[in-house]
Amino acid sequence: MKKTALLNIALSRTIAGLGHGDILVIGDAGLPVPPGVELIDLALTPGIPDFASVLRAVLSEMQVERHVLAEEMQKVVPPGLVEIERLRGKLGKREWLSHEQFKVLSRSARAVVRTGECQPYSNIALIAGVTF
């Protein structure tokens, strides 16, 4: 059995397969998943699992070079934004896009991780870095 915090097989496998510059999106329950992009659906009930818990678990295994957020997040300030700020040292450089541009970016993702989060704009695109 694994020693790290992340137990979900599909998510762990996806992270292990990421290369430098690959994109992994963590999204709220309402974020559309583009056709052809793998969906890792963790949603169980509204709010479970929440965005922040999934982000922490992903960061336990993923090296992140930079991250992208929707500009609308700054106006709504969902609870996940507090966690993003707390984890900023593990997230690299920040970029802001409109929510529509964020959805276009998600077309290039290796996978979208769907959480049970129901707070608007609780989405982040993580761009993989390297550990060397």
UniProtKB/Swiss-Prot annotation:
Broad EC category: isomerase
Keyword Cytoplasm included in the entry's annotation: yes
Domain of life: Bacteria
Gene Ontology cellular component list: cytosol
Pfam families hit by this protein: RbsD_FucU (PF05025)
Localization, UniProt: Cytoplasm
Principal place of residence: cytoplasm
Pathway membership, UniProt: Carbohydrate metabolism; D-ribose degradation; D-ribose 5-phosphate from beta-D-ribopyranose: step 1/2
A biological process from GO: D-ribose catabolic process
Signal peptide residues on this chain, from the entry's feature table: none
SUPFAM superfamilies linked to this entry: RbsD-like
Molecular function in Gene Ontology: D-ribose pyranase activity; intramolecular lyase activity; monosaccharide binding
Catalytic activity field: beta-D-ribopyranose = beta-D-ribofuranose
Record-listed substrate binding positions: 28, 99, 121-123
InterPro entries linked: D-ribose_pyranase, RbsD-like_sf, RbsD_FucU
Record keywords: Carbohydrate metabolism, Cytoplasm, Isomerase
Catalytic residues identified in the record: 20
UniProt keyword Isomerase present: yes
EC number(s) recorded for this UniProt protein: 5.4.99.62
Quaternary organization: Homodecamer.
Task of the protein: Catalyzes the interconversion of beta-pyran and beta-furan forms of D-ribose.
Stated family: Belongs to the RbsD / FucU family. RbsD subfamily.
NCBIfam families (UniProt xref): PRK11797.1
Descriptive protein name: D-ribose pyranase
Classification of source organism: Bacteria, Pseudomonadati, Pseudomonadota, Gammaproteobacteria, Pseudomonadales
Name of encoding gene: rbsD
